[in-house]
Amino acid sequence: VKDPRHGGAGESGEQGTAGRQPKPKAKPRVPAVKGLKDDRFAGKTVRPGDTAEVQLKVSETVSHQPGRIPAIVLRGERAGPTVFVMSAVHGDEINGVAIVRHLIAGLSGRLERGTLIAIPVANRFGFDANDRYLPDRRDLNRHFPGDAKGNMALRIADHLFRKVVAISDCGIDLHTAAAGNSNLCHIRGDAGDAAVKGLMRATGVPVLVHSEGPRGSLRRAATEAGIPTILFEAGEAARFHRHAVEIGNHAALQLLSHVGLVGARFQPPAFQTLVRKSEWVRSDHGGILDLRVDPGDLVERKQPIGSIYDPYGRHVDVVHADRSGVVLGIATDPLIHPGMALVHIGQLDKTLQAARDYVASGGDLGYIRWKPPLRREGA
């Protein structure tokens, strides 16, 4: 399996698969009428005003037991849109699991209208093994909308898409960076789609990143099927970040307010910027990395952002920012090879000074501190 760091971190990185990845279906069937048909979901009746915990079968285990994933369905008394919240499509990305828990607890089983379908653990097999991938080493988030007759990943993706995504009006997919990386709390989506852009802005998250998403990703497949979907990206794999969970929970509530499921008034952010260009700064040398920046830091082009040392402690190279902007993500593993992704910088042109002013006034860009920088003389 390829190390995601070779292609960047999180949803957009190059991910390992077993052999060549089959192409998912291009045009999934999406019902004309959204929501629960006959008030039923996964064989269980969920009437308006009800809340139900459901087990959704998506596969089978090696012991021939049903491979089920948990789902929580909340319904308002009045008719309205259906929204899905999906988490742990990558099994070791668990911040979203906590976000769903806090979201459901905060709603206390009450919606003003419409339906919320929350999937705290989409990749049950990876989650049980604390692994990003499925047992066949495929990345579930490269196989949507799926195929009922395809490989394991395609079949699970097909179940999730047909039973959850296709009956929804919009959705949000919750992710973290891949192992060995940490990401700023930010929203990704296809800002060229007006409905998607509206959802992105509605979350109130300060940093938005324009990206259609990799082919086969949940949000891209859903958006192409006419179901505008965005992605919340924050923190790192296999651990909870309290701050990321708080921001993600608030973002999800803002989205639900925007589409009318909850009565809370939408609170516009004091600052918000849309990043349209971003690149990873990569290493030209192997060695031991000492980074000077964290996700959320603002940097200037040519600014030193880290140093590389050899095992004897000798200085090998200085890493510089290749553009001015905001640090979207960093490598947290200090052991690097040439070409590895070190720092992901989102380019800010007109809004860089506004971002600085916002931070200076006490504003929060979704900052996540990985570790105190190790300062060295002469570095």
Regions found by a protein language model. Give the residues of each.
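Structured catalytic-domain cores with a bias toward divalent-metal coordination
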Residues: 2-379
